[in-house]
Amino acid sequence: NIIEQIENFNIKNNNIEISTTQKSPSALDIDNIHSELYSEPKDAYFTQNPYCIYPSENGVDFAISIDEAKNLLKEDKEECSIPLKVLYPNITTSMLGNEAFPDLLSQYSTSYSTRDQKRTTNLKLAANKINGTVLMPGETFSYNKVVGARTISAGYQEAPIYVSGKVVDGVGGGICQITTTLYNAVVYANLDIVERSNHQFVPSYAPASRDATVVYGSIDFKFKNNRNYPIKIMCTVSNGIANFQIYGLRSNNDYEVVISNRVTGTTSNAIYSEAYKILKQNGQVISSTLLSQDVYKRH
């Protein structure tokens, strides 16, 4: 049978002839490439019934005309590169107004000295980067990614920072107060903390285990939107008050959040502390979750 013939076939003693045909490659069709690549930017919008937010999307297009792209192919080159450009929507997700984020989920404030103008400048620069940020469900916020590098060219000033257990002047000093204020607002909104670190010393603007520090490139503050709907972060730095507000849509499953922090021990060189997130409903404690256990150096 056929199977036996195949098994008994010895390729070394038999020649196999395969007919081939030569065919030139198809010419590149710029119009077709453009139609497959091109995408329109999409404006953000929302509906109230049912409640749903549709985020904005960037588009893409040739950075040159189609005729210019076709002329590139006529050049005698082995490779041809067509530059591209991003098309931005007219209405981004962060531009959606209060109607899209009707409920105040949480807010938190810390105070700062307006006499230190350089530090105040740093606070405002960092806050402005975060203000208006929208997080979709499941999306993670990275402080370092959103705020970016703290450099002189970005407008940051030298102000006191903690380095190797000492207080020295450094570019961007003070922005950890923005991190700390946001951290507390995030906890009160009952969002998931992904990454958070405490300072070397207990800062003046927050009690032990209620702070959050960042160092660009090494220490970040991250949290995740664990809600079913998008949230929007609003912040202001004015008249000695740094304030964060987180907006979204409340649900029947939301709890009252209480943060309980305490110093658990001290030595001549260190302070030990911890913080818990307590969820309440109708005055009854539903759960108590450890947020952090921290160690600080004494000044």
Which functions belong to the PLM regions below?
Residues 15-20:
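A cross-kingdom signal targeting lumenal/periplasmic-facing segments of multi-pass membrane
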Residues 4, 21-299:
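Well-ordered beta-sheet/strand-loop patches within structured domains
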Residues 8, 12, 33:
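Aromatic-residue-lined binding/catalytic grooves and analogous aromatic/hydrophobic interfacial grooves
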Residues 12-14, 227:
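Short flexible coil/turn linkers enriched for glycine and charged/polar residues
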